[in-house]
């Protein structure tokens, strides 16, 4: 139910370019690939190489060709592929990484869990002038987003 809630907050749409941070087994990358369709693109980052390879294999087996994987530090995002219409983060950050908000397009949205006392899920919307709107929801638990 957590993934469904995150996707409901993110509101991915056909043709969008989305960054999937902490892509793991490839499950959320595949869901996003289906939603954005052939005109869209998913960029999936996983810091654990073997898990990235596992996710990449799973997504390929399912026939999705619009997903590109990277072994890397999700806190830093993927600046070479930025700007993203949406960013989905699948691990809890201590703070919202500035690199991710910078890589979000004006009009874009990001969903990110925070490692705080409330177990917050944060929805961010980036206005056309670059300012951010924020909504928080509590009661979630995630593995930590590691900066390395």
What are these regions (language model features)?
Residues 123-143:
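Conserved Class I S-adenosyl-L-methionine
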Residues 11-129:
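Conserved nucleotide-cofactor-binding alpha/beta core module
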Residues 1-7, 11-12:
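Conserved SAM-binding loop and adjacent beta-strand
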Residues 146-148:
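Short, surface-exposed secondary-structure junctions/capping segments
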